[in-house]
Amino acid sequence: RSLRAPGVQEFKWSPCGYDTKNGGIERNGGTPVLSYWSPEKEEDSTPASIRLIAIPERTVLRTITRSMVDRVELHWQPRGEYLAVQVLRHKKSKKTHYTNFEIFRMKNLHKDIAVEHFKQTEEVSQFRWEPNGNRFAYIYGDSSTKGNVDVYTMGDASNKGKMEMLYTIENRQANRLFWSPMGNFLVIAGLDNINGQLEFWDTDNEQSMSTQEHFMCNQICWDPSGRVCCTAVCQPMMFGSMSMRYQLENGFKLWTFQGAPM
């Protein structure tokens, strides 16, 4: 049977199931959760909505609404403990944009789902969860000149589970973020039109381990162990000057997790 979701723009499934009666995450089984968003309707002043629904019960777990919304992106943490909703909003003039984040804590579905909010006054170009941890990072500002990267934690026993910003990595030519599968190590990259600027960052120690360049790099991939990172210039499957441009630099490089060439 179809699920009614008028005007839905995007939906994403949770990466795991949940115990909706007692709380907690179930890696094998449990109730999956569907998240989706629908845009606002100016003709009848209906705001944009983000909704979480338990399937197959079709129980609405949480709904939030926002006005003056241009775009929404849904980011599930790989372990399913959190859902980050990135909301690009405009002011009444529609000339100025800013970003709101709504972070859903998913561990206690048997209670009301807690949602944390914060605002970034500039447009965010990319958001990424740490795969094996409780941190996230995002890029904002003009990445073609000098953008910034903010690193947050969702909290642990050391700070009583409080979400807080850890620090800002300032003035980086970057438009993509690539976490190691094991967490902690992060590649801050400027791909495509930024021509392959690479910085290997140690999140725990808040320090840059290495700055490198792979000219015209447009793809980055970590090996599953998190020990090796591969950067590549991949030729688009098309004809014309764009394809020829990448063909001249086609190839790959391997780096240690610290950013040393292999």
Task: Spell out what each predicted region is.
Residues 5-27, 69-80, 116-135, 168-182, ...:
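Conserved beta-propeller blade repeats
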Residues 79-81, 85-88, 106, 132, ...:
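Short amphipathic alpha-helices and their capping/turn residues within compact interaction modules
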Residues 1-10, 55-70, 106-123, 155-173, ...:
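Multi-bladed beta-propeller domains
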Residues 172-203, 207, 211-240, 244:
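Loop/turn-rich, solvent-exposed surfaces of beta-rich toroidal or solenoidal domains
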Residues 48-56, 98-109, 150-156, 198-202, ...:
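Beta-propeller blade signature
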Residues 50-56, 63-65, 73-74, 78-86, ...:
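Extended repeat-based solenoid scaffolds, especially LRR ectodomains
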